[in-house]
Amino acid sequence: MTFLSPTSLETRVGQMVFVGFEGLTAPDYVLERLREGRIGGIILFARNVADPAQLAALTDSLQANAPYGVIISIDQEGGTVARLREGFTESPGAMALASARDRERLIEAMSGVLAAELRALGIHWNYAPVVDISYYADNPSMGTRTFGSDPETVSVLAAAAVRGFQAGGIATSPKHFPSAGHTSIDTHVALPALDTSLEHLRQIDMMPYRATIAAGAASVMVTHVLYRALDAEYPCTLSPIVVHQLLRGELGYDGVVTTDCLEMQAITNHYGAAESAVLAALAGIDAILFS
């Protein structure tokens, strides 16, 4: 299939936008915006999935309506966060895999199996692995999604996941930079504002990012948490300091940087949709995600 290259400013900006939708088939407004080049990517959820045949037909239809091409993405971490379940290959969550014998090899192999299935279904990008360090057992948004509380272990296992997925042709997105592990506040419902020191973030929380970047991570997802030591005004997702100075500058990352979903209340309680999208772009974000 031959794709066009975006030429107008509107289509160039549109290629930064990722959206979700309700239902097992794409609504007309999504297909229209794809044809116009005003959407660059789609994020799939369980609400879009019935079985493998239906999902493959859905991704085919999205591509058929996208002259500029469309990137299909999903959260398929395994365990508690998996959009593909019955009829698909299921994986244990990160913490369970981290408890297994020969865990590094197992995680790389399991990621490769999942990657092969995702590619066959027409999916390109998996928002995984979670590389947050587990600090609180009652962290409502983390739970067993993390590889654990030891930064060296998390680094080794997260890098294995990146290698496995990307060897199978699926882009990964270690998340949530620089960390969503320091709070018991769920960013789906509120904006955490924390006093964690920059030195701690550098020495501990950014260790898995150094490892996954070295492993070739195609993208990094930025958290909605506000760290006062980094930027007292903006949450990380909307912060040029975090994206440009810390991720791009200090870590030397030159891959794709994506927001977490801008419809989470950590953002919507403080910013409108258009405002948050513009601020994210100005911060240096490449992919702007709405669900």
Task: For the regions a language model picked out, list residue spans one by one.
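N-terminal basic, low-complexity leaders that serve as flexible interaction/assembly modules and, when applicable
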Residues: 1-39
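Second-shell residues forming the walls of enzyme active-site clefts
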Residues: 8, 20, 26-29, 47-66, ...
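Short, conserved acidic/polar surface loops in the N-terminal third of protein domains
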Residues: 82-87, 93, 137-139
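A charged helix-plus-loop insertion that forms the helical arch/lid used to bind
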Residues: 88-103, 146-148
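Alpha-helical scaffold segments that flank or form the walls of functional sites
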Residues: 99-123, 205, 214, 276-282
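Short, conserved phosphate-binding/catalytic loop or strand-edge motifs used
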Residues: 131-141
